Design a protein with these regions (language model features):
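Short S/T/G/P-rich N-terminal loop/turn motif that feeds into the first structured element of a domain
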Residues: 1-48, 53-65, 88-90
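C-terminal structural segments of small proteins and small subunits
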Residues: 60-85
Length: 90
């Protein structure tokens, strides 16, 4: 799950998305929420939220730690403020 607090460079976000999508799909990740209309009820105002479902917790960690995903992640450095969490489902 990724909650964006600030996006300074939308073009870099697009470049990141192009690279991140195949990395996520390689680990059988399924995008459940990817941007779209949202309403903040409590906490920080967020222009974008992304939720990806993986087969299990460890696969999500493997994806995040993979060279492919980290290459995509590097594109965002200095261009966004976001809160990224890997949460085990029930």
């Amino acid at each position: 799950m990724c909650v964006y607090e600030k996006i300074d460079n939308p073009e870099k976000l697009k470049q990141y998305a192009v690279k991140a999508k195949p990395a996520v799909e390689k680990f059988s990740g399924k995008f459940l929420v990817r941007g779209g209309k949202n309403r903040t009820n409590d906490g920080i105002e967020s222009p974008r939220t992304v939720i990806v479902q993986f087969p299990d917790y460890n696969t999500a960690i493997e994806c995040y730690d993979s060279a492919e995903y980290q290459e995509a992640h590097d594109i965002l450095k200095g261009h966004v403020v976001r809160h990224h969490q890997i949460v085990e489902g029930s």
